[in-house]
Design a protein with these regions (language model features):
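Catalytic machinery of carbohydrate-active enzymes
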Residues: 1-166
């Protein structure tokens, strides 16, 4: 959201699994969503090559890998070979391992996920201010948007858990 509002003249395409489309549909006018069914259509090397061709056809000027998993590593290699501007997230795994180590624990604050995402964007030439607080509450604490109707109403017997998948 911060990228979309701070750089309104760039076109942003989010690539993710189909379930995530609802999170990005009405986010900002310069944000679009592209589905990738990695369980079926893009589940192997042949599929990843097809996905790569589909992505190249979009003529992106920069690629931000916020996931950094085996599939995205492969796609990153392909984009790097073709000289696209590519940046990927640093998950700071070594620091996290030291933080939870049984011996010689090193208690150093690790960067937040938001900071890691912002670092990826900065590497691509789009530094963002991390002053975002909510899509649903303005800077004065007033509710600006009701939760989407797709969520429905919680009944007294249900337990809801909020998860941020990105």
């Amino acid at each position: 959201y911060s990228l979309a509002t701070q750089y309104p003249n760039i076109r942003i395409t989010v690539l993710s699994k189909p379930f995530a489309k609802a999170f990005f549909e009405d986010l900002a006018s310069n944000v679009s969503f592209m589905e990738a069914d990695i369980k079926k259509e893009y589940s192997n090397i042949k599929g990843l090559n097809a996905l790569y061709r589909r992505l190249v056809a979009k003529n992106f000027t920069a690629i931000a890998d916020f996931h950094s998993i085996l599939r995205s590593h492969y796609l990153r290699i392909r984009f790097n070979i073709d000289r696209y501007k590519v940046a990927h997230i640093n998950k700071h795994r070594a620091g996290k391992r030291r933080l939870i180590s049984n011996n010689n624990k090193v208690l150093i604050q690790q960067p937040t996920s938001f900071r890691n995402y912002a670092d990826v964007l900065a590497k691509l030439g789009y530094p963002v201010n991390l002053d975002f607080t909510s899509l649903f509450i303005d800077k004065y604490g007033r509710t600006t948007v009701q939760l989407p109707e797709a969520i429905g109403t919680k009944n007294s017997l249900q337990q809801w858990i909020g998860i941020a998948p990105f």
